């Protein structure tokens, strides 16, 4: 930690480094179809101590210090495992370059696998659409991957036909 008067000298600090990384993610990765990433929260300062869940942080600092620690947690969504690995490679490359006086690392925690539309899923979706229209309801089409969430079906979708992501978009914080 150092005094803020020297921030543009040899130590930019952890918050500037996190901002640089996030902006480079945006510049290099935005616009790839089916790929989204979102920094869900940032905690930075003199100290940033997480609880056992890793989602609640107690942060301390002052406005006149160069913050030595920043934690960013986010979400990465993708349409295929290959796309996931390409995005992670770009992210690792960005993180490996540092502003003077800084260091950074990135880790990834897998939760839900990718779930591209499979031929079996397309067949079931076509049947569902046919029934929907026969009952006088609107056509049912596959939604853009960027508008869908993760579903438990993604774990078995490579092995059995299925469809997911047809529910209402909802509202509030999880829409």
Where are the regions that the model predicts?
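Metal-dependent amide/peptide-bond hydrolase catalytic core
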Residues: 1-175
